[in-house]
Amino acid sequence: MRTLPHKLFAVTAILAIFPIIGPGSAAQTTKKKPKYNVLFISSDDLRPELGAYGLKDIKTPNVDKIASRGMRFDRAYAQYPVCNPSRASLLTGRYPTETKVMNNNDYFRRIDPSTVTLPQHFKNNGYVSLRSGKIFHGGIDDQVSWTEGGEPTDPNITERGNPNFRPTKPANSDPAQAQAQTAGVNIADSNSDRIVVLDGDGENHGDYRTATRAINFIEKYKDRPFFLAVGFVKPHSPPTAPKKFFDLYDVKKIPLPVDFGATPKALAGAPEISISPRNSDLFIGRESTPELSREMKRAYWASTSFMDAQVGRVIDSLEKNGLKDNTIIVFFGDHGYHLGEKGKWSKAYSLYELGLRVPLLIAMPNQKARSTTRIVELVDLYPTLADLCGLPKPTNISGDSLAPLLKNPNAAWDRPAYSVTQYRQSLGRSIRTSRWHYVEWDEGKSGAMLYATEKDPHELKNLSSDPKYAKTIAEMKQLLAKMPVIP
């Protein structure tokens, strides 16, 4: 359990969830609680900008379908704004300062071989644990966690080896045509900073094959309780999709952010360290003009819609095999992403709202569409799924079950979200409450930020140096002091 104060107890969480999951509570029957399957879907670099989140211009009908029968978490946060540390955290139920995974190359089990991961916990309790696509990280996986699918991640799926990006080429397309689709960037210059238009339906792309493998797993194990993790790479750079998904969007109608910049730069009043001066994914070493930025954002949206189509193929298979009513579906992004805000086209090192906030949906069988504005964290997924499926409570984890919020979106919940990043040998820490977002680097020695998030959702005005907010900053520091630190 986390050390932050709260009034939730394990008994409350367990009892509260039974009405959601239908008949079969201990008070009503002596039948053994059924083992629900878990379909655990992740998307890389995905912002909470989906139809289900109110952005109707972005076409994501299949993810929206998950939301239509589940809980939408409007304020869910990653614990680290980079893939490997974030995934290691949520899959172990521990904060990055506990896993000590603070970059894209560390492997959590080298640090703590005794760790029991989320899929491993299900595997140890009678489930078949299955992996398709990118779940832990490209080039880094954890074979002991899986019954099947634990082989090293295919770089053709993840588009990333370790530590360098691998080339991604449009399937069976003419090189000259592909070159014309790179928003002015030579393909040879960067495997990440380009736009890729696929032929056909994208059958040869890694995400399409990830969905196909997941479908095969569903058909193979439909008669056994399973934990199936499906990791889609898109919309991670390079933004990639078949042409029909680009055609969904009129580039002239794509908006630019209020704090758009040609190059990455912290706004006046914010510490320089808060924004890396060089993009690491898109617009690397070059300016992002409004015209090129709209083209890139269109490609990101097209890539999101392509990923959504693959989600639909997996959901359709679940329903085709009669598993809709006994499967919990989780859909989430692994961290946030900047699309030109403050000139940044990446997520790396960003402790801003955009770097940390993620989409999170949890659909229980027979549940209606609802939403909650309570602050939650990805580190909560491990204890939540163990709770919902009646597994023994995992030990040595820091997350808390979200079962009470699935029962009542307005349940008492006084938990903030804690996130960290390491940049230039400096440790940045973030605490997010319902009203405030506070960030400090090296305990404030290298800078700090305080934003009144309701009044300033774009985080334009840093209040950390205003003496009127000294009491608020002291309270935020007290919350940070209760969180794990690196020994």
Predicted regions and their residues:
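Bacterial N-terminal signal peptides that target proteins for export
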Residues: 1-12
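Formylglycine-dependent sulfatase
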Residues: 12-15, 23-442, 446-449, 457-485
